[in-house]
């Protein structure tokens, strides 16, 4: 066997350059880019390996470690998990900045490879710059924090350990059932240490994602339940998208008259105007899907984690409603006391469709149509919500939705906009709705937009977020300028955390700490004037084109101008506080105070206790 002498970092880059994923006979190169924020813990190791060349991986310069890792997460999500962008950081604070992004990727079942620098394996110069010492164990470093948010963690304390570590990292990253964040911590001395690696380690390696088929026993049990159902419903989760099973899902629902609701991750897989599409389901869902859910006697949940926002904290469905969960991940199949179908979504849906030949549900077709149309009428009311005081949030959203083309991508993650968008947004082509709502990570929108644009450079990308998110994290706006990427950043400025203020008020609390106001010297509280911020000026300082918008006319004019020039654009849209959509036929369990001197809080607690009497306990 022939060998080649390389540093560990050089070998890592060479290995990543030869990784491919195959799905349905089509190969996808798994790594074409790598993000990095260089520091002393990586610049002369991985940085040197990247600079030296001899590979086909492009370096992308992140501006903040968390934010570039969020961009990498969004990239992999938009690529249906068939390509990733690894992220390199220095040690200490640079490494720690990526922990949040790791949690985001793992919560959403998205592959993310993190390569943080670490302290010296030899320990000779300890304690080194940016090293935190732990008195209980010399072997512990801050990168151990990744263990709690990653599906695979390893620390490379010898250069030859790369071979087993890299293979196991790829095993997890390419496994649809077990994917999430992966961390390979790299002691900075080991990055530069050389080893005679076997050339076979660097051969082209194809990871095959063979579709897992449904077993005969599982299929028979599911068909027995479905055929006995009069009012079945389906839930379209993100797994349908990642399995590229939208056509099979639509065919099953249309053929057998099974209405369906969409999760945040599943929305946009199918057009909004399909007759069986009842829209968003759950806490941030709409009236149509939630009312159908309350009447359903069987629910077929496909590719969904069944989070509290989908099930309304397990309150939405009737006591006698049975669940069938079709999922590639065993962990998800037993939720809601379901009959499990452990298989690929496309393969499982096709088998169910064939097995249900001749079956059609007992739903009244006219009633379903009326329920759906009533909700569409409500959507139009929100989109046409004109107010003399200024722009409402839903009116601005509607203007942008109607302006965008079917191929344009809309994305978001946190605040009140995800609720508005799951309820109201009318998606175009498949894959044009990109919502991170597993972790609802503030900052994903502003930075993830970079990743989405890198994944789909031929499409226009519109990112939706509030002023709270922008203030928290927006460093990769500059990277969009650097990479000549036109991204449309739609900032809805309501002077605070409007979503949380709304929750606060709905649970009996007065507004407190959720609006951006000056400290009042007379009261000592944050109840002074609202803090005015010129976000457009801030964006211009980075090199973006930017508009300040207060009227419908200004918004339409800015949208037109934004599409006809090469720069990334920020639309600073001043919207009326509290002008988001309310909830519809749903409930969400939160930690309301059991004891309080505030009467409205006492009432909110009692209302919650009443709802708890109607929930499923598991």
Locations of regions flagged by a protein language model:
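N-terminal alpha/beta PP-like core and its mobile active-site loop of ThDP/TPP-dependent enzymes
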Residues: 2-362, 399, 403-406, 486-489, ...
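Conserved structured core elements
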Residues: 6, 10, 28, 243, ...
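A short, structure-level motif marking secondary-structure boundaries and short turns
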Residues: 31-32, 85-87, 128, 207-208, ...
């Amino acid at each position: 066997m022939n060998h080649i002498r390389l540093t560990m970092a050089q070998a890592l880059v060479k290995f990543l350059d030869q990784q491919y994923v195959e799905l349905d006979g089509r190969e996808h190169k798994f790594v074409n880019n790598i993000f990095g924020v260089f520091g002393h813990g990586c610049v002369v190791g991985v940085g040197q390996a990247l600079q030296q060349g001899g590979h086909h991986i492009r370096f992308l310069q992140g501006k903040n470690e968390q934010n570039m890792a969020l961009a990498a997460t969004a990239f992999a999500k938009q690529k249906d998990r068939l390509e990733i962008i690894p992220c390199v950081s220095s040690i200490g604070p640079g490494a720690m900045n990526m922990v949040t992004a790791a949690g985001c990727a793992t919560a959403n079942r998205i592959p993310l490879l993190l390569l943080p620098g670490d302290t010296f394996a030899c320990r000779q110069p300890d304690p080194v710059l940016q090293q935190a010492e732990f008195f209980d164990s010399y072997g512990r470093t801050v990168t151990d924090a990744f263990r709690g948010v990653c599906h695979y963690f390893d620390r490379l304390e010898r250069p030859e350990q790369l071979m087993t570590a890299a293979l196991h990292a790829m095993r997890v990253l390419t496994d649809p059932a077990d994917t999430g964040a992966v961390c390979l911590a790299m002691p900075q001395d080991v990055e530069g240490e050389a080893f005679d690696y076997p050339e076979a380690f660097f051969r082209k390696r194809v990871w095959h994602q063979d579709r897992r088929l449904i077993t005969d026993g599982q299929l028979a049990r599911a068909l027995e339940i479905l055929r006995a159902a009069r009012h079945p419903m389906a839930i379209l989760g993100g797994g349908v998208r990642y399995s590229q099973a939208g056509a099979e899902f639509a065919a099953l629902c249309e053929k057998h008259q099974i209405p369906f609701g969409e999760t945040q991750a599943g929305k946009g897989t199918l057009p909004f105007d399909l007759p069986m599409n009842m829209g968003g389901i759950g806490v941030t869902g709409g009236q149509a899907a939630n009312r159908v859910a309350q009447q359903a006697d069987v629910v077929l949940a496909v590719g969904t984690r069944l989070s509290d926002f989908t099930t309304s904290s397990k309150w939405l469905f009737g006591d006698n409603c049975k669940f069938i969960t079709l999922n590639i991940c065993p962990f998800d199949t037993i939720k809601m006391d379901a009959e499990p179908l452990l298989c690929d979504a496309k393969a499982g849906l096709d088998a169910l469709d064939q097995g249900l030949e001749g079956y059609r549900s007992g739903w009244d077709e006219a009633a379903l149509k009326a329920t759906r149309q009533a909700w569409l009428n409500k959507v139009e009311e929100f989109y046409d919500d004109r107010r003399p005081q200024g722009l409402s949030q839903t009116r601005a959203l509607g203007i942008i939705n109607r302006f965008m083309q079917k191929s344009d991508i809309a994305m978001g993650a946190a605040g009140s906009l995800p609720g508005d968008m799951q309820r109201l947004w009318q998606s175009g082509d498949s894959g044009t709705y990109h919502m991170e709502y597993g972790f609802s990570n503030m900052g994903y929108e502003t930075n993830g937009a970079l990743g989405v644009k890198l994944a789909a450079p031929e499409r226009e990308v519109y990112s939706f977020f509030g002023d709270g998110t922008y203030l928290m994290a927006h460093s990769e706006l500059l990277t969009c300028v650097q990479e000549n990427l036109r991204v449309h950043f739609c900032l809805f400025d309501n002077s605070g955390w409007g979503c949380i203020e709304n929750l606060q008020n709905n649970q009996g609390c007065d507004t407190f700490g959720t609006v951006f106001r000056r400290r009042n010297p007379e009261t000592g509280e944050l109840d002074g004037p609202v803090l005015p911020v010129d976000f457009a000026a801030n964006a211009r300082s980075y090199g973006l084109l930017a508009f300040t918008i207060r009227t419908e006319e200004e918004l339409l004019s800015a949208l037109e101008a934004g599409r006809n020039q090469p720069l990334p654009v920020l639309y600073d849209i001043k919207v009326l506080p509290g002008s988001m959509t309310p909830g519809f036929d749903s409930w969400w369990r939160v930690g309301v105070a059991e004891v309080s001197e505030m009467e409205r809080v006492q009432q909110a607690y009692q209302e919650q206790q009443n709802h708890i009497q109607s929930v499923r306990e598991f």
